[in-house]
Amino acid sequence: VSFNYTEFKDDGSLILQGDAKIWTDGRLAMPTDPLVNNPKTTRSAGRALYATPVPIWDSATGNVASFVTSFNFLFVIRELKYTPTDGLVFFLAPVGTEIPSGSTGGFLGIFDGSNGFNQFVAVEFDSYHNIWDPKSLRSSHVGIDVNSIMSLKAVNWNRVSGSLEKATIIYDSQTNILSVVMTSQNGQITTIYGTIDLKTVLPEKVSVGFSATTGNPEREKHDIYSWSFTSTLKEPEEQA
């Protein structure tokens, strides 16, 4: 599977859920835009998923896909006097996934705190330090999450509000290593990696996309300007 959005269009190739919108200038906004449209809205969640399911492993062969995805995005704080909340995630989840009930704020639109079973692999770009986050982390951090809002691994993220960020996420199925490289417009670079066997966590086909949330009141907007994704799953060898 391979696709590349240099700008976003409302052409049906993305499934929008909750408070998400594609603007005419080509950006994908989640939430729609608290700075302009919803100044009094509290606790919002929006998601955007690629409409075509992505094969991530093959039960017949045991082969697992490798993938690389890159995207440019922007966080803007509504008012500097407020603490920014809450963040953006790139995630893989079962086909048909919906926004869980009660998953706004720190649950980032992917985690249902009332349900003991959550199925996803995610990279979070979090702007708020919640009680489940390690004390060593500052408010802004990048984490790798597997079926839990408590990160498998996390590192501090030196971000600046209004700075364009570029994230590249690579999964190598030979080593099971998921690596993340963040490059900020201000020159800061953030890296993190973790080991995940996708076939033990996810079904054979998944949805891929983004989720973003705000807290109470909405204090931050998240805009995505471009997104590319390429996955490679080795085909079964033909019998002679």
UniProtKB/Swiss-Prot annotation:
Binding site for Ca(2+): 126, 128, 130, 133
Keyword Calcium on entry: yes
Gene3D superfamilies: 2.60.120.200
Tree of life domain: Eukaryota
Residues linked to a glycan: 4
Keyword annotations from UniProtKB, A to Z: Calcium, Glycoprotein, Lectin, Manganese, Metal-binding
Record: residues binding Mn(2+): 124, 126, 133, 141
GO molecular function terms noted in the UniProt entry: carbohydrate binding; metal ion binding
Similarity comment text for this entry: Belongs to the leguminous lectin family.
Protein's name according to its UniProt entry: Anti-H(O) lectin
Annotated source species: Lotus tetragonolobus
